[in-house]
Amino acid sequence: MVREDAEGPAGHVRNLDDGRRARRHPGDWCHAWLSECRRALKPGGLLVSFIDWRQLPTLTDVVQAAGLILRGVAVWDKTLGRMRLRRGGFAQQAEFVVWASRGAMRGCDVYLPGVFPCRLPLPKQHVTEKPLDIAREVVRLMPAGVVVCDLFAGSGTFLAAAREAGLHWVGSETNQAYHAISSARLDATTDDSGVQPRSI
C-alpha cells in the first residue's frame, strides 16, 4: 500500500524540496510520482491519498491517468471543533481520501465506513497531520506481509499505525524537523513482536 498526502499548507501541493509547490500544475507533479507508485505497487496493491477539496478533481483524474483504478473517495469529517467557517457559504470541515488499486483488488474481509468523524488532538505535530485513529482504520485494509509506504511521512502517523498492526513500513520525509518527530514517534511505538524500530 502507498499512503500519501500530496497537499501542503493552504492547498499548495507538496514539493520534495521546500514543502510547497505552486498550484498551477499540480497534476504534472502528481502524475510523475503516481506513475512510480503504480510501478512499485504489486497487483492488487492500494493507493490511499488524503487531499483537500481544492485538489480533489485533479487528483482523481491523475490517479487514473497514472494507470491506477479509482475505487472511490471517502471523507474525513474533522467535526465542528476543527472546521473553518466560510461567510455566506459552507464550513470547510472535511478532507477527502482518494483510494485506488493497481488492477483487481485482493480479497479482504474488512469493511470501512465512507465517512470518518474524527477530531485531531491538539497540539498538532504537523500542518497536515491525520488522526492516528483514522490511520489505524486504513491500515486494516492491508494483509499481513505487505509494506506500507508513506511518501510524505510528516509526523509519522501512518507509519506508527502500520507498526502497531505488525506490518512492514517505509517512510520518506525530507524536512529535518518532521523527520525527527516521525523518528521519535516510531521509537515510542511497538508492535506485537516488541521490536523497536531504528529510524525512517
Predicted feature descriptions by range:
Residues 183-196:
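Short, conserved SAM-binding/catalytic segment
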Residues 1-180:
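Core catalytic lobe of class I
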